[in-house]
Amino acid sequence: ISVAELLAGDIRANANRAGNMLKGVFYVCTICGNVVHALGEGSFSCCGSTMFPQEAEEPDADHAFSIERIEDDWYVTLDHPMTKDHYISFVAYATMDGICFKKLYPEQSVQPRFHITGRGRIYLYCNQHGLFTSLTPRK
């Protein structure tokens, strides 16, 4: 329960999402870029502001990333601006029982590798356009 909810008397029950990491929710601070991944909805704040859940969308033409198997890894690539004002903040690989984050920074290329631990989803967050997702290919 957040302090704001407690003071307002607005207490909401958190629905259990059965602990499946693929059903998790991403929250991103619009000020500093801090990221929270939660298995259910929550009330999070950062830098004095409320963090809102991000809705993952299918990649558009500017955010269409490729997922390629190289040995025992998923190799994710995307040709995207990586300037201080417009960049990919993180790429994550989620399966039913785990999640792995790769934090990216301006002027760094978007080429993370993730050890394959099962079928899952790749999530990619653009600081200007939001969260995008795609299923990993079948092994």
Question: Where are each of the predicted segments found?
Answer:
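Short metal-binding segments enriched for Cys and/or His
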Residues: 52-65
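Cys/His-rich microdomains that often coordinate metals
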Residues: 36, 50-51, 130
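Cysteine-rich micro-motifs
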Residues: 40-51
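Short cysteine-rich clusters marking metal-coordination/redox-active sites
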Residues: 29-32, 46, 126
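Exposed aromatic-hydrophobic patches
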Residues: 77-78, 110-117
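Residues immediately within or flanking Cys/His clusters that coordinate Zn2+
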Residues: 26, 43, 123
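Structural beta-strand segments of beta-rich domains
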Residues: 72-76
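Edge beta-strands of extracellular beta-sandwich domains
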Residues: 128-139
